[in-house]
Amino acid sequence: MSPAMNSITDTLGTLLPNARKLAGVILKQSRFCFETDGEVLPCAFFVTADGQPSIVGVPELSDETKPSVWAMVAHLRRTHPITAFVSEVWMAKCEKDDMNPDGSVKVMPRDNPNRKEQVMLVLWQGSRQVSFTAEITRNPSHLGDWKVMFDSNFPGEKGMTSLGGAMMEGESYPMEAN
């Protein structure tokens, strides 16, 4: 059975008792960054040995910083029972109006101020991985509901796919942080 719950915090809470608290920190931080700066800055989150949620800011992801960021996340995964990583992902949807009749793009998504993009949250507990995405728009500024993209415990279910595959429509979670 898939992790269909009333909220993303309930889903995260089923993975580890302290995950509800961590989920609140993650969602509040993501919402605060987006409302303040118009973007979601990359961050790593983890639960300490005494069960407290903690946050680590990471540099903006680039070809130069990715190896050190992933090394840090890998270290957190080895040393903490639950780890999460949040970042905007470089993916934008092309609307039908942005396409030429031959299928080529007449307006590149990066040049469209009204483009729709994605924020991704990846959560690990031991060998289990659950990934969520939320759609964002910048004009007007809006951070949408979270959807399950992948759950390693349920790899074959509708709405979930491997990280290497195309994203499929997932289950929706109202944006909340309590």
Give the ranges of each region predicted by the language model.
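N-terminal domain-onset segments
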Residues: 1-74
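Low-complexity intrinsically disordered segments
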Residues: 78-178
